[in-house]
């Protein structure tokens, strides 16, 4: 039992530490001697804040994977419906106007689905873009390349497996809906 009144009386007493000793019978538990008896102090701190739940989700999703080439990658394996960014559309060649404009068109079409945030990634090379989106938990990276101009399809890379699949424009909406919602 703990009396909050006695705690309040000593809250500004900096010498209270001198009354705390370790019980010889306990392995590593701290004990306070009061009237010749040993009492193991305990605190119950109920908390139901959003921060703790968020931290638990982030902690569970964070992982570092060793790759075959000896390097490692950081991955935030959030469930797709929890991920703040649902997909990143990445043009393979940043200075090719046709690829960039097609990438923006793909992004615009996917945003109309209303699944969440779809971003256009136009910085760095493709490998660095993939790693960046692995770290921030983006489940899918959609790459628009030179083949996309001819065959009207894109390469979709899965964050967790790193597998890449070619998907036609007409099937991309359904693929994204199934991946994000399931």
PLM regions and their residue ranges:
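NTP/phosphate- and nucleic-acid-binding module
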Residues: 1-182
């Amino acid at each position: 039992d703990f009396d909050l009144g006695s705690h309040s009386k000593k809250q500004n007493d900096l010498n209270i530490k001198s009354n705390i000793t370790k019980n010889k019978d306990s392995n590593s538990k701290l004990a306070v001697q009061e009237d010749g008896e040993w009492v193991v102090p305990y605190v119950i701190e109920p908390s139901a804040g959003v921060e703790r739940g968020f931290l638990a989700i982030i902690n569970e999703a964070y992982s570092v994977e060793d790759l075959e080439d000896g390097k490692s990658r950081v991955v935030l394996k959030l469930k797709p419906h929890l991920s703040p960014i649902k997909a990143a559309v990445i043009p393979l060649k940043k200075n090719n106007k046709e690829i960039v404009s097609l990438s923006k068109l793909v992004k615009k079409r996917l945003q109309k689905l209303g699944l969440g945030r779809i971003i256009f990634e136009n910085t760095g090379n493709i490998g660095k873009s993939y790693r960046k989106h692995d770290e921030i938990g983006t489940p899918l990276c959609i790459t628009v390349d030179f083949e996309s101009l001819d065959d009207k399809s894109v390469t979709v890379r899965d964050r967790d497996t790193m597998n890449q699949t070619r998907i036609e424009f007409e099937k991309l909406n359904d693929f994204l809906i199934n991946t994000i919602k399931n």
